[in-house]
Regions:
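Active-site-adjacent structural elements that line small-molecule/cofactor binding pockets in enzymes
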Residues: 1-313
């Protein structure tokens, strides 16, 4: 069982460096960063991970751009894997995005994870001039573009949104045959996307039981796509808060679905349960405010949970 952590994307260079260096020293598999370009004043009712769709963040909360942050994180570390959880694929030109990931993979020594999703915040799409209704087909085509650019000597793809031919795309990623693609989402469409394009189903804000209930469909769709289900790993990302950790106050953020808010022993039991269900990787973000408190929770996680995960293999 592998465990990664999600970093707050706050404009605190020293804090980000300390978080990444500490995560690497503690033995976590990965540090991941989320993706938003803008957030709407007044919140939204579209958030897919709360019963009412409510998602309220401070309107002036600063979020660093994801690819820029991953480059900084790569320079702060030497071994830990780095990735997006998840990058909203329709927001950026796919050829440029593929180039950025390939460049970071080369510069980091082959440590990148390409976590992708379709997005959910319609206002953000409107501001960026991207058609919200097309986000699914765009994501599928962009993933096909990534695969062509990363694996073909002379990439070719004739799609609805982009036509690619007569070019070289260099350098290729260090990782072969390509940078691992972690497909986010919790719908049947996301599972079919994983089956066709992904190396990992990286669902978020769900329960372990939800994951287990959907694994038969994922395996079925993977076989229909002509691929071996054993080649696709399963990752679950959730918010984590230890209720018995001294000096750790739960933050003010939205309690999204699947949050793990419990004692240390209950978290240990949950890791065992996830392993029994066939989940290969867990990514946690922390329900505390600020990078300093996040580091404290991460250290508690490393002390009490990482050894359990390592014994599970």
């Amino acid at each position: 069982m592998k465990i990664g952590v999600s970093i707050p994307r706050l404009p605190d260079a020293d804090g980000i460096r300390e978080f990444c260096e500490r995560a690497e020293r503690l033995g976590f598999e990965s540090v991941m960063a989320g993706d938003h370009i803008v957030l709407p004043v007044g919140g939204t009712n579209q958030y897919p991970y709360t019963p009412t769709g409510a998602f309220q963040r401070p309107s002036d909360e600063p979020f660093l751009e994801t690819m820029t942050m991953l480059g900084f994180m790569a320079a702060c570390t030497s071994e830990i894997r780095l990735g997006s959880t998840v990058l909203i694929l329709p927001y950026r030109n796919p050829v440029v995005q593929a180039k950025m990931f390939a460049s970071l993979d080369v510069l980091s020594g082959g440590r990148m994870i390409c976590g992708v999703g379709v997005g959910w915040l319609e206002k953000e799409f409107d501001i960026l001039g991207v058609p919200y209704a097309d986000r699914g087909p765009m994501t599928d085509e962009f993933l096909a573009i990534f695969n062509a650019l990363w694996t073909e000597e002379v990439p070719e793809l004739q799609g609805k949104y982009y036509q690619i031919d007569g070019i070289y795309f260099e350098p290729k990623p260090i990782q072969q045959p390509r940078i691992p693609i972690w497909v986010g989402g919790h719908t049947r469409r996301a599972l079919r996307r994983t089956a066709k394009y992904g190396d990992c189903w990286h669902t978020t804000r769900q329960t372990p039981d939800f994951v287990a209930e959907n694994l038969p469909y994922l395996r079925e769709q993977t076989e229909l796509a002509g691929r071996d289900p054993a080649d696709i790993t399963i990752s679950l990302k959730r918010s984590l808060h230890f209720t018995d950790m001294d000096g750790s106050e739960e933050g003010v953020g939205v309690r999204s679905g699947g949050a793990l808010i419990n004692t240390t022993q209950a978290v240990v039991d949950d890791v065992h349960y996830c392993n029994e269900l066939g989940i290969d990787q867990l990514t946690f973000d922390f329900r505390v405010d600020g990078i300093g408190p996040c580091i404290q929770v991460m250290e508690h996680l490393a002390e009490h949970i990482l050894p359990v995960a390592e014994r599970l293999g």
